[in-house]
Amino acid sequence: MINNHTLGFPRIGLFRELKVAQEKYWSRKISKEELFSVGKTLRVRHWQQQKELGINYIPVGDFSWYDHVLGTSMLLGNIPKRHKNGNDLVTLDTLFRVARGVAPTGASVSASEMTKWFNTNYHYIVPEFSIKSEFCFSWRQILDEIDEALLLGHQVKPVILGPLTYLWLGKVKGKKFDRLNLLKEILPVYKYLLSEINDRNISWVQIDEPILTLELPEKWKNAFRFAYQSLYGYNSLLLTTYFGSVQHNFSLICELPIQGVHLDLVHGKYDLVFLNSFIPEKWLISLGIINGKNIWKADLVMWFKRLQLFSKLRHSLWIGTSCSLLHVPIDLKLENKISSEVRSWFSFALQKCQELTLLRDALNNSNTVTEDIRVWSQPIHSRKKSAIVHNVDVKERLKSITSNDFKRNNVFSVRKQKQHKNLKLPILPTTTIGSFPQTADIRKARFDFKKGNINHDQYNTFISKHIQNAILKQEKLGIDVLVHGEFERNDMVEYFGEHLNGFVFTEFGWVQSYGSRCVKPPIIIGDVSRSKPISLDWIKYAQTLTSKPVKGMLTGPVTILLWSFVREDLSKKIISRQIALALRDEVLDLEQSGVKIIQIDEPALREGLPLRLSLRNEYLSWAVDSFKLSSSGVCDETQIHTHMCYCEFNDIMNAIVLLDADVITIETSRSDMELLEFFKEFKYPNDIGPGVYDIHSPNIPSIEWIMTLLRQAMHYIPVKRLWVNPDCGLKTRTWDETYYSLENMVRAAKILRKKL
């Protein structure tokens, strides 16, 4: 008998209830108890929804107040000293101080670093390790939630992040040492947790070790053997992998004293005959056959045919999602503004639970394809011929691309001289990354415009006033290169998608990016093209308000691709080129209108990197080409900027050089300029702006702090190529936080200029 399960469920709530409650708590508008009540309501609802849709094993432990990696740090008592508020008591406010640098109680401090969760747009809080790190069971959240779910009568499957993946994701702070040395210290905490779970008579524990998709050093493989031998005997462990194939680590996995393994069949290509022969017969095999990272309906007929024989060969088989459903919206039923034809192609979290149940029942009860799964899968096949999907003009334009379309006219050194003459910027030029605060009145005006409560002219007048205000503030601050503030944009990807052909949009398709930050990714359903200019009028208007240069602000092709739900019938390379051609037209329109600086943001470049080293060069090749296709049509005098944030840059630095952007701005402040260590050996040839303060924390940086970071940067980057800027856009900050932070940033730059 086949069972089904999910690896995790979205936390935020259908209407972002968790986000609302978090932000009210942070601003002291509700109590901790009220926040806890919202969390419990969401958990109870989500467990019940999965149960009603036929899910056998309900995941518990997937809920988090900010991030599940941070939750693991809390459980282990791994809290940086600066966040402890003078004692060892681990509380909810401790968690928020680690994540944000500030909480309703305790002193404000620097937040812990944040970076991307493998190859997704979800961010986790990076664990910090030191030689003096100590661990003890300190956070009962998962046990309390298990008790909640058991009391409600659910068949519970606890979800915990495995010890090796936890250590891999962390960073050593201070004196360098091998963080694997901490494994013996954290295993007793895992043993205690597993014993507590065992006492509750729970049959299976999902222990996530996604680093098994990587090509691990031998010492890490040995650490797996040691760790899981130590954890043997407590519970039936379902070793869970996702985001890729682990076939290269099968020998290691099969050595481990575990009772089952979960494999991602969506993102890892496995031969089922090989699986059956290789994996021990007594083990449970869980097959991730429903895509947890994308919103397309599953071809259940295909999966039925593929799994039918395999299901009869295995004594114990589960089917599940490829990964946690954290990465997809909750319910498709609310999306009434999408045409019925297009909507029939999609499947959100609740619909994916339906898919698992339909397929489970068909495999358990039938030897042939059932009518239920045939009807479910039919729209997948009709979509292939839909006129909505295909555009002949786009296909023809792709064929006309030549090698010259990927090249600037001259090398950077020549361009820099022309740009200096054209722009006349001071040394250590100051700028921001693009967005300014999206206040409640801006969000209301956008909502009213979409609902028809105000007309186009009223909305444009409103946005124009905010742009004017932003320009005035920047001029008062003395910033050198200005931005228009992006007040007309709801999201850096969604906005461009709304103005390109080939996209559709949801009303309630929210997914968590980090903490309370949620995004509503566009869905790429067809060939992409641009019908008319997107950002031109707003940038032109902003430039009329000042004699200083105003940057044209665009989101890059790779980021639009990766931060959308992408179609699966076409390669990412081709889709990215389609987007790049549309953006190339936008870039040339901006240049023709007199815009001297154009920023094309690519924060997702690193995110798209395949987990396997052997596959990375191919991805980086087409990703770089897509950026260059969008940016290389301009003349030498036009300065191209790009921005990247919250990722590990070192392993893509060669690709960043190949982008050939005149200026790159990057996140470095949360890691105390740690990234710049790389520049000791690697001489980045173009201009660079390492972020000098963390915009994801409400803390206002001091002039001295910013000067310290800039002095550090000067050790690695020639001052003539150094820019001064925040880490990222300022959309989520208040105007007071923004103004005073930028004021200190500009003052720091001016003080240092005088000393040079």
UniProtKB/Swiss-Prot annotation:
The record's cofactor note says: Binds 1 zinc ion per subunit.
EC number annotated for this UniProt entry: 2.1.1.14
Query: Protein name, please?
Result: 5-methyltetrahydropteroyltriglutamate--homocysteine methyltransferase
Q: Which residues bind L-methionine?
A: I433, G434, S435, E486, D601
Q: Which cofactor names does the annotation list?
A: Zn(2+)
Q: Which Gene3D superfamilies match?
A: 3.20.20.210
Question: What is the top EC class of this enzyme, as a single word?
Answer: transferase
Tell me the organism's taxonomic lineage.
Answer: Bacteria, Pseudomonadati, Pseudomonadota, Gammaproteobacteria, Enterobacterales
Q: Which reaction does it catalyse?
A: 5-methyltetrahydropteroyltri-L-glutamate + L-homocysteine = tetrahydropteroyltri-L-glutamate + L-methionine
Which amino acid positions bind Zn(2+), per UniProt?
H643, C645, E667, C728
- GO MF term list: 5-methyltetrahydropteroyltriglutamate-homocysteine S-methyltransferase activity; zinc ion binding
Species this protein is from: Buchnera aphidicola subsp. Baizongia pistaciae (strain Bp)
Single GO BP term: methylation
Q: For binding 5-methyltetrahydropteroyltri-L-glutamate, which residues are annotated in this chain's numbering?
A: R16, E17, L18, K19, K116, R517, C518, W563, E607
- State the active site: H696 (proton donor)
Primary role:
Catalyzes the transfer of a methyl group from 5-methyltetrahydrofolate to homocysteine resulting in methionine formation.
Report the CDD domains cross-referenced here. CIMS_C_terminal_like, CIMS_N_terminal_like
List residues binding L-homocysteine.
I433, G434, S435, E486, D601
What family does the entry list? Belongs to the vitamin-B12 independent methionine synthase family.
Query: What pathway is this protein said to act in by its record?
Result: Amino-acid biosynthesis; L-methionine biosynthesis via de novo pathway; L-methionine from L-homocysteine (MetE route): step 1/1
Q: Tell me the superkingdom of the source.
A: Bacteria
Q: Which UniProt keywords apply?
A: Amino-acid biosynthesis, Metal-binding, Methionine biosynthesis, Methyltransferase, Repeat, Transferase, Zinc
Membrane-spanning residues where?
A: none
